[in-house]
C-alpha cells in the first residue's frame, strides 16, 4: 500500500465515524439468505462484516434461511416437495429433515463463518429458550366451481405467535452473536418450519432493532421503470402494494418489513445481498444499496 492508498483508507474510516456513533450499542437484525449465502466470497465477506459490527459496538442478531439446502437433502432422501404461495408444504417426516438441515447443518456453517472472522457467535434455533412460539399457518383458496373458500393445510408450517427475546438478551449481554435457525415451537410442543424472512421480521420487532437488514437477490424495491426506490414510508409501501407496482415475491418481503416496523423496529432495509459488504455499505455510508422502509 502506497501513501496515497493509505490516505484514502484513512479518509474512508474517518467518514464512517458519524455512522459508528449513530449505531453504537444498538441492535441490528440481519436476515441472511439467497445468493449471499451460497457464493463463497460473499459468504466469507458476510462473516467479516458481522464480526466487524460486533467489534465497533453494535449488537448483531443473524437469522438465516436454508431453502436450497433443504431441497437438496429432501431430493437425496427422495422426498417430494410441494409449494403453495411460496411455502413448502411440510408433513411430520419432512419437518424432522428441515430441522436437521437448518439447526444441525446450516446454522453451524453460518456460526463458523462468523467465528472464523474473529467474533464469538452461538447457533440456536427458535425453539431454544422458547424464542419463537408459533402457531400453524393456513392458507385459503376459493374453489372456482363452488365459490367457497377452502382452507389449505400446509402441515407443519408455522407463523410466529410470540417472540420471547430473553435468550437473545442473555447472549448479547455475554458478548455473543446469536445465529438463529427459523424453527419454532407450538403450544403442543410440535416443531414448525417458519419462513426466515418472517422470523427475522418478528424478532426485529420484538427486540426493537434499529435496523432489520433483509439480504435478497434483487437491488431492492423497484419502481415502474425498474429504478431503485431508495426510501419508502409505510403508507407509500402499502399504496404501491395495493396498486400493483410492488408485486410478486417482493410483496411478502415488504410486508415483513412493515410488520417489523409496526412491532417496534425503527426501520427495515431490503438489501442486495449480491453486493459485497452490503451490510456495511448500508450502515456506514450514505449510499446504502437497497430500499429503506420506515413508519
From Swiss-Prot:
Assigned protein family: Belongs to the acetylglutamate kinase family. ArgB subfamily.
Cell compartment(s), UniProt: Cytoplasm
EC number: 2.7.2.8
Protein's UniProt keywords contain Nucleotide-binding: yes
Keyword Glycosyltransferase listed: no
Major localization class: cytoplasm
Entry GO terms, CC: cytoplasm
Root EC class: transferase
GO biological process: arginine biosynthetic process via ornithine; L-arginine biosynthetic process
This protein's name: Acetylglutamate kinase
HAMAP family: ArgB
GO MF: acetylglutamate kinase activity; ATP binding
Amino acid at each position: 500500500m502506497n501513501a496515497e492508498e493509505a490516505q484514502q483508507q484513512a479518509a474512508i474510516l474517518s467518514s464512517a465515524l458519524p455512522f459508528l456513533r449513530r449505531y453504537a450499542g444498538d441492535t441490528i437484525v440481519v436476515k441472511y439468505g439467497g445468493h449471499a449465502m451460497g457464493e463463497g466470497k460473499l459468504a466469507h465477506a458476510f462473516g467479516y462484516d458481522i464480526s466487524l459490527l460486533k467489534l465497533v459496538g453494535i449488537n448483531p442478531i443473524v437469522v438465516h434461511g436454508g431453502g436450497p439446502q433443504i431441497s437438496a437433502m429432501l431430493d437425496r432422501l427422495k422426498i417430494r416437495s410441494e409449494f403453495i404461495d411460496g411455502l413448502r408444504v411440510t408433513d411430520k417426516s419432512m419437518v424432522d429433515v428441515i430441522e436437521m438441515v437448518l439447526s444441525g447443518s446450516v446454522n453451524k456453517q453460518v456460526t463458523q463463518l462468523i467465528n472464523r472472522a474473529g467474533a464469538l457467535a452461538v447457533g440456536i434455533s427458535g425453539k431454544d429458550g422458547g424464542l419463537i412460539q408459533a402457531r400453524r399457518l393456513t392458507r385459503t383458496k376459493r374453489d372456482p366451481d363452488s365459490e367457497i373458500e377452502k382452507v389449505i393445510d400446509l402441515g407443519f408450517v408455522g407463523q410466529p405467535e410470540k417472540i420471547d427475546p430473553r435468550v437473545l438478551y442473555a447472549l448479547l449481554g455475554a458478548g455473543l452473536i446469536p445465529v438463529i435457525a427459523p424453527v419454532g415451537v407450538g403450544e403442543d410442543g410440535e416443531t414448525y418450519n417458519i419462513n426466515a424472512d418472517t422470523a427475522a421480521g418478528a424478532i426485529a420487532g420484538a427486540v426493537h432493532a434499529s435496523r432489520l437488514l433483509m439480504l435478497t437477490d434483487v437491488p431492492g424495491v423497484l419502481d415502474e421503470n425498474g429504478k431503485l426506490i431508495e426510501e419508502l414510508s409505510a403508507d407509500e409501501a402499502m399504496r404501491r402494494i395495493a396498486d400493483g407496482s410492488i408485486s410478486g415475491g417482493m410483496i411478502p418481503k415488504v410486508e415483513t418489513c412493515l410488520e417489523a416496523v409496526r412491532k417496534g423496529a425503527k426501520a427495515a432495509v431490503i438489501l442486495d445481498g449480491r453486493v459485497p459488504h452490503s451490510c456495511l455499505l448500508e450502515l456506514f455510508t450514505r449510499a446504502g444499496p437497497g430500499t429503506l422502509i420506515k413508519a
